[in-house]
Amino acid sequence: MRMSRREMLALSAVAAAAMPLVARADVAGTAPDSLNGLAAAKGLRFGSCLGTGPSGAPRQAGVTGDRANQFDDERLKAIFVRECGVLVPENELKWYAIRPNATDFDFARADKLMAFAAANGLLVRGHTLLWNRDIWMPPWTQSYNFGPQPAKEAERLLTTHIQTVASRYPQVFSWDVVNETIAPKTGEMEASVFTKAIGPEVIDIAFHAARAAAPKAQLVYNDYMSWGLGNKVHRDGVLRLLERLKKNNVPIDALGVQAHIGPGASDSTNTLEGENEVAWRKFLDEVTGLGLDIIITEFDFGDQTLPADAAARDAAVAATAKHYFDVMLSYKNLRYVMAWGMIDKYSWLRDRMPRADGLLKRPLPYDDDYQPKPLREAIAAAFRAAPERRWLLS
């Protein structure tokens, strides 16, 4: 499997000063039997998030913050470089990570990840330029004085942020421009400091600003709608948003499907079969009909209600995940898959919705001892079975 010249040259702005952080013989994820290698054989790519600190958002309820710094884990990074061709910063590009106040930016953690990606030949996704929910914005935004012309000032603040971040990292080939702006229970746009000042057009402004700052990047709306019970309202709300953006010639290229799946996930609590699968495929068909690509952006598996026995649990996770990937990969406008972590112990799900029996969740392709699990083989098998397609950057 040969990597494209563009991928080989996907270097960060800070690459010149970066030293290789993991010993490697070639560009990351090029081994034919790696997950990225198997994906690339079908015109796909595979990657994962990686963080520079304890996994999980610092303001998220229940996050303990006591796990080891994953970026200091050389075994994790070795697995990452072997298996992945794409890196997305877990939290390091979010407003709360880089905006200590209204005038300053702190890119130290993000720069570290960009240097790692450059040193190892990894493509980079960006997540996220606007998480349009107040709970995930830095506290100072709630008391910010937007002055006598709040709409104008809010637009300035937002566009300055997007232009500053996106222009700093021109190597990012795909940006989550807006994240989770549709309320699952109502299907309407979440209220935020920006929607209060500007209205729903804040989303349009964000995408136009992203296109101006990153003219060649794939621009994405990212959300966690699913086939699950009661999710029709969420799906319909996302579709209405996408339809409006396309109608208004807003520069959007793809829908990111977060894919936190499983009976203990935040997105879906029932199985992808029967009427659920019909409804989900209908949604994906409608997204495809808008001319948009589809991306799996944050895959993991919540196993909180599955059997206690690890072998039985892992087998159930693998079987369910294999079917999910088979459904998703049947769409040729889906060109890459991102996991939300590679090693169980660094998953944000370890701190979210714990199992009643107290056992630790096993949501990712590798276990706490850095050994591949049946989930890893399920993903590999899905790539082997996937129809071929043209890679996004060809």
Named regions from a protein language model:
Residues 1-19:
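N-terminal secretory signal peptides and thylakoid transit peptides that target proteins
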Residues 22-49, 394:
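C-terminal segment of N-terminal export signals and the immediately downstream linker at the start
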Residues 39-40, 74-84, 112-120, 166-170, ...:
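Acidic (Asp/Glu)-rich catalytic clusters
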Residues 46-48, 89, 124-126, 219-221, ...:
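Hydrophobic faces of well-ordered beta-strands that scaffold small-molecule active sites
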Residues 64-81, 158-164, 233-244, 321-324:
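Short, acidic/polar
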Residues 86-100, 109-226, 303:
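Substrate-binding cleft and catalytic face of glycoside hydrolase catalytic domains
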Residues 176, 181-182, 186, 191-197, ...:
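Aromatic-rich peripheral "rim/lid" segments of glycoside hydrolase catalytic domains that contact
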Residues 197-205, 214, 218, 235-240, ...:
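Glycoside hydrolase catalytic-domain groove-lining segments
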